[in-house]
Design a protein with these regions (language model features):
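Electropositive, glycine- and tryptophan-enriched low-complexity nucleic-acid-binding patches
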Residues: 62-66, 71-72, 132-195, 276-291, ...
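Short, conserved catalytic/metal-binding motifs centered on acidic residues
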Residues: 51, 104-118, 145, 197-205, ...
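Long, charge-rich low-complexity segments
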Residues: 80-91, 104, 384-410
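Short amphipathic alpha-helical "interface-anchor" segments enriched in bulky aromatics
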Residues: 114, 300-332
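An internal, acidic/charged active-site-proximal segment
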Residues: 165-280, 358, 362-375, 408-410
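Gly/serine-rich nucleotide phosphate-binding loop at the start of the catalytic core
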Residues: 1-77, 82
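Active-site-proximal, Lys/Arg-enriched surface segment
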Residues: 69-156, 162-164, 262-263
Length: 410
C-alpha cells in the first residue's frame, strides 16, 4: 500500500526520491518513505505505534524504532536535501522580485518552544516554565531559527536546550538559549543580494547576539525587557522610564496591519555599547507599552513594528508541527532517536510548504490563501482514495474479503 500511495502522488514521489542517496539500501529508504508519509497522512498520535497504523500493511513499530534509533543512514544528507529544495524555491522567488525592482527583506526569526512530555525516563527531559500553562511542566525545549521571506516560511535550524543542572548531571557542557541561537545564526548562509533581519523576543538580545549579527552583516529587530538601559539625549534610563519624562506631544501615531499604535522612537546606545533605534509602542486602547530595538537606524517606527510582526509566523509553525505533524508525539527515550524523529517531521513539513507554494503560484486569484493544513488535508483525502481503490482492485481480481483483510488490515 505504501508504494501505491506514493506512486499515486507524483509530487510526493519526486519529493521523497530526492532523499534516496541518504540511505544505504532500499529497505532503509522504504522505512524513510513510510515514516514521512505516516507523519503526513495519519490523523492520530504520530508516535511509532500510530505511524505503523498510518498505512495499511505498514511497518511494525519495532522496525520503525530500529530505523530511527539504530540504522546507519545519513541524517546530515537528509537535512542538506531538505534545505536545498526549500532554498532553491526561495532563490527563484527572490530573482523574480529582483526583476521587478522590489527590495525584499529576509527575516530570520529566533524563538523557542516547549514540547510537553510525560515520560521522565526520556533523555534530556526536564521541568521548564510554560507561559501558556503558567507553571513548570515536564518536556523538551527546542530553540529554532525560522526563515520568512516573500510568503515562504520554514525552519533553517533547531537545537535542543538543556538546563544547566541537567547538563551537569549528564556530564555535558551547558549551552544557554542565546548561545544556541548564535550557533543557528553562524550556520545560516544568507541569501545573495538581500538584507537579513534577525527577529527575537526579549530573551535573546544579549551582547553576544548583537555582536554576532554585526559580524555577519545582519540587522537585529528585537523586543527588550522594560528594565533594559537605553542612553540618548543625555539620559541613561530603563526603557520604561522614558514614558515618565516625555511630553505628550512627543508621541506619534502609526497604523500597521489595520491596527493603530502610539509610538515614540529615538536613536541611542544600549548598555552593551551598540547603537540602536528604540521604538516604544502600544496598541491604541491598550495600557501596556512594548519596547523594540533595531540596529538598522534607517527604519521608520512603522516599518520596525511591521517587520517584527513577521515573527508570528513561527507561532503558526509551532502550532502545525505539534498538532498536525507529531513534533510532540515521540515516546522514544533515546535522544538520538528523538532528534531523528524531529528531522523527519521537518522533512514532512518541507513537503507541505513546497506544495503550498506551488498551489499559490498556480492559483488564479492573486490574493488566494492556502495553508499547510489545506495541503495536508488534500493529501490525506487522496491517500484514502488510493486505499479504497486498492480494495476495489483486489475485489475485482476475485480476492475474498478475508484475504483483503489479511493483506491490508492484518
Amino acid at each position: 500500500m505504501l508504494e501505491a500511495i506514493v506512486q499515486s502522488h507524483e509530487s510526493l514521489s519526486k519529493f521523497l526520491a530526492a532523499f534516496r542517496d541518504a540511505f544505504k539500501n532500499r529497505p532503509q529508504y522504504r522505512h524513510f518513505q513510510a515514516y514521512v508519509v505516516g507523519v503526513l497522512i495519519y490523523l492520530g498520535s504520530r508516535n511509532l505505534a500510530g505511524l505503523s497504523r498510518a498505512i495499511p500493511d505498514g511497518r511494525n513499530p519495532c522496525s520503525l524504532y530500529r530505523f530511527v534509533a539504530e540504522m546507519d543512514w545519513d541524517m546530515e544528507q537528509v537535512e542538506h536535501v531538505r534545505w536545498e529544495m526549500l532554498n532553491r524555491r526561495t532563490r527563484r522567488a527572490l530573482e523574480a522580485a529582483a526583476r521587478h525592482g522590489k527590495p525584499v527583506p529576509v527575516f530570520l526569526a529566533i524563538d523557542d518552544s516547549l514540547v510537553e512530555k510525560t515520560g521522565k525516563q526520556m533523555e534530556a527531559v526536564d521541568y521548564h516554565y510554560s507561559h501558556s500553562a503558567g507553571k513548570t511542566v515536564l518536556g523538551h525545549v527546542w530553540v529554532t531559527g525560522h526563515l520568512i521571506v516573500l510568503g515562504q516560511s520554514y525552519p533553517v535550524g533547531w537545537r535542543l536546550y538543556r538546563r544547566q543542572a541537567t547538563c551537569e548531571a549528564m556530564g555535558v557542557p551547558f549551552v544557554s538559549k542565546p548561545e544556541l541561537a548564535q550557533a543557528i545564526l553562524r550556520a545560516f548562509d544568507p541569501l545573495p543580494g538581500t538584507t537579513t533581519y534577525v527577529l527575537t523576543d526579549s530573551w535573546y538580545p544579549s551582547q553576544d547576539i548583537l555582536d554576532e549579527c554585526q559580524k555577519r552583516g545582519f540587522h537585529l529587530i528585537s523586543a527588550v525587557k522594560s528594565n533594559r538601559k537605553f542612553k540618548a539625549t543625555g539620559h541613561n534610563l530603563q526603557v520604561k522610564q522614558w514614558t515618565q519624562i516625555l511630553p505628550r506631544k512627543a508621541f506619534g501615531f502609526v497604523t500597521v496591519n489595520a491596527s493603530g499604535y502610539q509610538v515614540w522612537s529615538a536613536t541611542g546606545r544600549l548598555s552593551s555599547g551598540h547603537w540602536v533605534k528604540l521604538v516604544m509602542n502600544r496598541v491604541i486602547g491598550q495600557e501596556r507599552w512594548r519596547y523594540l530595538v533595531t540596529t538598522d537606524l534607517s527604519l521608520t517606527p512603522q516599518t520596525i513594528i511591521s517587520h517584527y510582526l513577521a515573527r508570528w509566523e513561527v507561532e503558526n509553525f509551532y502550532r502545525v508541527a505539534k498538532h498536525s505533524l507529531g513534533w510532540g508525539d515521540y515516546q522514544m527515550r533515546d535522544l538520538f532517536a528523538i532528534e531523528r524523529h524531529v528531522q523527519l517531521m521537518m522533512v514532512a513539513h518541507a513537503y507541505l510548504e513546497l506544495q503550498r507554494q506551488e498551489a499559490l503560484a498556480s492559483a488564479a486569484d492573486a490574493d488566494a490563501h492556502v495553508t499547510l493544513g489545506d495541503i495536508q488535508r488534500q493529501l490525506q483525502s487522496l491517500s484514502r482514495r488510493t486505499e479504497i481503490a486498492q480494495v476495489f482492485h483486489l475485489a475485482q481480481r476475485g480476492f475474498s474479503l478475508e484475504t483483503i483483510y489479511q493483506r491490508l488490515a492484518a
